[in-house]
Amino acid sequence: MDYKCFKGKHANIVIEIISLLEKGVKKAQEILEKPDAGSYTKLENSSGDTPIKADLALDKFLEENFLSLENIKSVFSEEKETPVTKENGSYLIAYDPLDGSSVMEANFLVGTIIGIYEKDYKAQNLAASLYVVFGHKIELVVALEEVYRYSFYQNKFHFIETIVLENKGKIVASGGNQKDFSLGLKKALEGFFAENYRLRYSGSMVADVHHVLVKKGGMFSYPQKKLRKLFEVFPLALMVEKAKGEAFYFDKGVKKRLLEQSVENYHEKSECYLASQHEAHILEKYLKGE
């Protein structure tokens, strides 16, 4: 893999994690391909969800590997109540081992989301983020100074492109229960569809955001407070911002950056809007003041 594009003080830890993922992809794929991988367990995780078997197997595999890195001080899975902490190290990892697990049985795209934090689990301390998506091919996307896309082939990640969103896209991934959408959001969505936008919502956040990124524009939204800040929202918000898009929420009708949100508890949830510039402008126009 070509690491020359990685710059800045966090480049080395990103390279270490990518090298670890590169070595572990086949094991992860093996976990996902087991016949009972999508079967639900009888457990409940810290967020109140019932994990599937692949959730727990991937979580265990990733935790062990992340903790093996000398410069990692803390590892925190969405499946756990609290982080696992070591004595030494500078960086903290928060991750969702299997985003989209609820649609895995339908053979939809799923993935692993990783946020790399410094000093503390706060949005302002997010140094970089990565995700791996598993489908008919395996891809890695990295947000550092820019956003880089790779494809896994013959045991290595191969560079595809640097992702930069265009001003306007053509797809909408609108999650949540539509009967609970605000009037402003309903009008915004009607406007998008009147302009021939295509609905591309799968139920897997990492898949839908990946679609927006590789298509170079569009909008992902989840207006209900369901998505976890540390494990999903912040890492993917960084992705979209570094790709020249916007990542935001609305607080009493005022548009605010997701990466300026505070974290009162580890498993706190948030609404989430990730969009290219045009879609962000339209959403603000209709949702402002609500």
UniProtKB/Swiss-Prot annotation:
EC assignment: 3.1.3.11
UniProt GO cellular component terms: cytoplasm; cytosol
Binding residue positions for Mg(2+) 2: 96, 99, 232
GO BP term (any one): fructose 6-phosphate metabolic process
InterPro entries assigned to the protein according to its UniProt record, in alphabetical order: FBPase_C_dom, FBPase_class-1, FBPase_N, FBPtase, SBPase
Compartments, as annotated in UniProt: Cytoplasm
Cofactor(s) of this protein: Mg(2+)
Family: Belongs to the FBPase class 1 family.
Superkingdom of origin: Bacteria
Protein name: Fructose-1,6-bisphosphatase class 1
Catalysis: reaction(s): beta-D-fructose 1,6-bisphosphate + H2O = beta-D-fructose 6-phosphate + phosphate
Pathway: Carbohydrate biosynthesis; gluconeogenesis
Record: residues binding Mg(2+) 1: 78, 96, 98
Gene name, Swiss-Prot/TrEMBL: fbp
Positions contributing to substrate binding: 99-102, 201, 226
Assembly and binders: Homotetramer.
Main location: cytoplasm
Keyword Magnesium found: yes
GO molecular function terms listed in the Swiss-Prot or TrEMBL record: fructose 1,6-bisphosphate 1-phosphatase activity; magnesium ion binding
UniProt KW keywords: Carbohydrate metabolism, Cytoplasm, Hydrolase, Magnesium, Metal-binding
Gene3D superfamilies in UniProt: 3.40.190.80, Fructose-1,6-Bisphosphatase, subunit A, domain 1 (3.30.540.10)
